[in-house]
Amino acid sequence: MKHPGSEKPQRTIAVTGGAGHFGGMVMRRLVEEPTVAKVISLDVRPPGWSHPKLEGVVGDVRDPELARLLEGVDTVVHLAFLISRYKPRSLYESINVEGSKNVFRAAVAAGASQIVYSSSVAVYGLVRDHPVPITEDTPRVHQPDFSYNDAKFRVEAFLDEFEAEHPELIVTRFRMVAALSPGVESMMGRSLTRGVIPSTSDVPWPIIWGEDVADALVLGVRQRARGAFNLSTEEPMSARDLAAAAGMRSLRFPRWLGVLAARLSSIADKLGLGNALDPAWIKYSDAVLVLSSDKARRELGWQPRCNTALEVLQRFRAESSETS
């Protein structure tokens, strides 16, 4: 009879994009898993911390010899993604789309039995006629003029075919709304730390706590869960209502001005002052993106620390002030 915690560590988990902020959150959880013997951080730079179970491997998701680096890996958690659309389009495409395909093919070639992919609410498309709430069965919508959606949509479309070709492979997908976490440079984060919530419409503001996303991914690894899982908070609120409840200021501006500001943010991006915001996020900001996370709660036992958007915002501001 096995006793809790008596499992022998035997799993090796590789995390692409492991040196990033979110990758670090996921790996710090994985090294504490009793069944995990080793966690491999696969990134173009080494992780900024150490642990007896952690191995840093400097590599590129586009490497044609990637399967060699993944030998002996049981599960691949694919987080690597170039967010800024202002990098050369060829680079954006090669890392986010072709790089993802290469990771999945290399994982199978190396003998991995599970792939965990960090997708996004964006795969459903930023459109106005979504059902409320959006479930995992809601059709995905391709928006080629929205680079983030274009990449995430095409990767998931590839995964559909790849999964059908490899029925023995466990494919786990997480589609989350915008995750807030202190220490991540962004236009939105800087605005929130100043006590301002910007918006162009009164649609619900979809946000989630970054730590809760990391928890969900680790649950997917631990349980070897198959399928897609939405991740969001409950009790959605508009930016105006959220600001009032949090004691913050709501800054409402016309959409055209937001698009212009997003385009100008490319200057900050090029200067290394944070990621630029794709103007498409503003262009389609009247989209209603209310996700149901019932499946993740029911099948994974996911219990987020922050259940509502208001709790996410309050925690973000509290922890941001502590680290500033």
Regions found by a protein language model. Name each.
Residues 11-32:
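N-terminal Rossmann NAD(P)H-binding glycine-rich loop of SDR-like oxidoreductase domains
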